[in-house]
Amino acid sequence: MVSFTLRAIGACLIGLPALITAAPTSHVSNGFHVVEQLNGVPQGWVQEGSPAPSTQMKFKLALVQGKTAEFEQRVMDISNPKHADYGKFMSREELDAFLQPSSQVKDSVFNWLASEGISKRSVKSNTDWLTFTTSIATAEKLFNTRFYTFKNTADGSQIIRTLKYSVAASAAPYVQMVQPTTKFSAPRPELSSVFTSDLEMTSSANVDCNVTITPDCIRELYKMGNTFATKDPRNRLGISGYLEQYARLDDFSTFIDMFVPSLKGTTFDFKSIDGAKNEQNSSLDSVEASLDVDYAIGLSGALSTYYGTAGRGKLIPDLDQPNITENNNEPYIEQLFYLLDLPDSELPAVLSTSYGENEQSVPPTYSSVVCSLFGRLGARGVSVIFSSGDTGVGSACQSNDGKNTTKFNPIFPAACPFVTSVGGTRQINPEVAIHFSSGGFSERFARPWYQELDVRYYLGHELEKGKWDGLYNPHGRGFPDVAAQSYKFATRDHGKTIGVSGTSASAPLFAGVVSILNSIRLAHNKPRMGFLNPWLYTIGRSGFTDIVHGGSDGCTGTDMYSHLPTPYVPGASWNATKGWDPVTGLGTPNFEKLSKLVLI
């Protein structure tokens, strides 16, 4: 497991392992170490039989990192405006060299693989990842397990998986994760919480910003004036596309003509990851993609790229996604491998992603690996921004470990310490927290040093003593970090102007703001901002408007996605309060102030 030994202010190091739930077992038997084991066949699948022993499978093996603490400290130093190394980002080559496992680690794993007939020459090595293809018969001996064919009860599709896998005791200290093994996944329509309604409008003229949000509303509310980013390749704005969502150029062009005519002619590049298509005439829903490009680019004007990633990610079913065909988990690793392999000159400076899922629905090893990879982007100077989610304190409100414990549900990757999580607000004069804005405290990641004082103050002074005890982890990473408008954004999709709500709107909005701030820094010969959070919680905090009205809700007794009965928690909520809170974070951006603070 990746260990987030993030330094607490005035305190000792805080380690991750004690805060991880449902971690892989450490049981050792017959010379093998059990890496991961499921409680049973995931909902939505039935075991059909056994694959032919000669069937070939490709496996990815993540090696344990020997420099985890040193790397995390390096990322924090690079990102801390009070440190001498602030802004001294690592190059691709420096990062690879820093994270390269020792010869002992690789040799031990290579020797184990070779003992089962997998030669070193047949294994592709990429820093701390190994990729190899072998037969089912060999894999079963290698991982001391049995692979089976599982059938999806909804669509009849079949996959080969196991419910438990192990590695030889000699290699166990060096192996973090192997996939595909225990991870079940299948396509389903996107799950992002965007609530749509048709709008009759052709421009921003005479818009009531309390009713409908347009780029002009955002610019006025957040004091952005007419400032845009310059089209600088050092400040590329990246937008993540998953789940067969396609950003349509004709809709985007119309949106710009209607709402930001000064950017007429602005467009974006498309990059395909893992064979993702660029369907410009698809009849499938593309609301999420449209919203993201409309506001990230429409507010910033930055040189932009839409990164489309094919496929689906890994899922442990829970009440929000009880059937594997309802899988919304995104293939983050595929995107991260692609980005981290890019030359420094081609990396985006900002990456906006408006997707997420319950933290517990992602296997612990998977979330740990992915979060660490986001940290690697931060080390290379990328600001990674995620929406906080649209389920308030939680929707399923129940653990999926077989115990069915009533609990609030934090969101991943929003609760990863290496991303900037954006919650939601609505209204103007005053701006208030919106009820669906997800927030809370991670069950897996320790509270990082940069927010220690803020979160500790909230828990000790703003939250009623004993309130929600047992429903959340008071030692976990608190999220969101900041907030922005998230209700009824005018956007274009499939030739119509519609209203869209969700923190899916907050993230690209904030990404657009950060892109302009980067442009200001670059114009003054300063490095771009990179991983934002250490700056946000120190110098940047005075550039945000504290939101003290409104709050989130959740745990209503009915799951908002599956509509299954769930635990009911009367009055479940995080309230917006003075200072940081787990619904709006530090508050909403005041660009006028931020544009000065970034030059300090």
UniProtKB/Swiss-Prot annotation:
- Name one matching Pfam family: Pro-kuma_activ
Question: Where does this protein hold Ca(2+)?
Answer: 546-547, 579, 581
Could you give the cofactor binding note from the entry? Binds 1 Ca(2+) ion per subunit.
SUPFAM superfamilies noted in UniProt: Protease propeptides/inhibitors, Subtilisin-like
* PROSITE patterns (alphabetical): SEDOLISIN (PS51695)
What are the glycosylated positions?
A: 210, 281, 323, 404
Transmembrane domains' residue ranges: none
The reaction(s) this protein catalyses: Release of an N-terminal tripeptide from a polypeptide
A GO MF annotation of the entry reads:
tripeptidyl-peptidase activity
Task: Give the UniProt keywords, A-Z.
Answer: Calcium, Glycoprotein, Hydrolase, Metal-binding, Protease, Secreted, Serine protease, Signal, Virulence, Zymogen
User: Where is the catalytic site?
Assistant: 288 (charge relay system), 292 (charge relay system), 504 (charge relay system)
Q: State the protein's name.
A: Probable tripeptidyl-peptidase SED4
The taxonomic lineage of its organism, from the top, reads: Eukaryota, Fungi, Dikarya, Ascomycota, Pezizomycotina
In the UniProt record, what gene is named as encoding this protein?
SED4
